[in-house]
């Protein structure tokens, strides 16, 4: 019976939604410097778009400062442009091959906006998890209708899918709560 339906595959897909949320939340600016803030930055390098981390080293020497060490001197202007074009609201200050980004304090209004964005990301992740649950339950129902699994197996698998869904939603809620706390901490 386990070869007809794999709950672990559903869990993996649900985990993917939580990982995606973690990545999206990492890109939200919280007033505290973080190397992950620059993950969405794309740089026009060598004739193609590349992630910033493929042309430079990003570090956080101070709580409100991000340092970008560009490997190739000819790429400094392109990296600056990529940072400005990313709409992160950061102003690059260049010294040779090092670009410094000061992270300004967030005002109350901007903090509330960021919390709303975080909630939107979390809701999208919850919806993705629910879609995975629906796919799983539909598959189980089809297997039962085709008499490939018994009604008891269907009920047991339905419960396992629901348990996996609850765990994934709880993880998403925890990620959101942590990010909200980080954003609202002055």
From Swiss-Prot:
Gene Ontology cellular component annotations, sorted alphabetically: cytosol
What keywords sit in the KW lines? Cytoplasm, Protein biosynthesis
Q: Which GO terms describe its biological process?
A: cytoplasmic translational termination
Q: Which GO terms describe its molecular function?
A: ribosomal large subunit binding
**Which InterPro entries does the entry mention?**
Ribosome_recyc_fac, Ribosome_recyc_fac_dom, RRF_sf
Q: Say yes or no: keyword Protein biosynthesis present.
A: yes
Q: Where in the cell is it found?
A: Cytoplasm
Record family assignment:
Belongs to the RRF family.
Role this protein plays: Responsible for the release of ribosomes from messenger RNA at the termination of protein biosynthesis. May increase the efficiency of translation by recycling ribosomes from one round of translation to another.
Entry protein name: Ribosome-recycling factor
What is the organism field in this record?
Answer: Rhodopseudomonas palustris (strain TIE-1)
């Amino acid at each position: 019976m386990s070869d007809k339906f794999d709950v672990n595959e559903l869990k993996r897909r649900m985990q993917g939604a939580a990982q995606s949320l973690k990545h999206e939340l990492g890109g939200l600016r919280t007033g505290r410097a973080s190397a992950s803030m620059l993950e969405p930055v794309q740089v026009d390098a060598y004739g193609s778009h590349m992630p910033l981390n493929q042309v430079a080293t990003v570090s956080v020497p101070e709580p409100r400062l991000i340092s970008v060490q560009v490997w190739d001197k000819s790429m400094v202007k392109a990296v600056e442009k990529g940072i400005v074009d990313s709409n992160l609201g950061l102003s690059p200050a260049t010294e040779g091959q090092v670009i410094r980004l000061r992270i300004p304090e967030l005002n109350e209004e901007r903090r509330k906006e960021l919390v709303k964005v975080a909630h939107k990301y979390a809701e999208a992740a919850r919806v993705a998890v629910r879609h995975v649950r629906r796919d799983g339950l539909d598959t189980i129902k089809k297997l039962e209708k085709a008499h490939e699994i018994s009604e008891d197996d269907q009920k047991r698998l339905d419960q396992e899918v629901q348990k996996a869904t609850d765990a994934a939603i709880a993880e998403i809620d925890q990620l959101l709560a942590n990010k909200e706390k980080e954003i609202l901490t002055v």
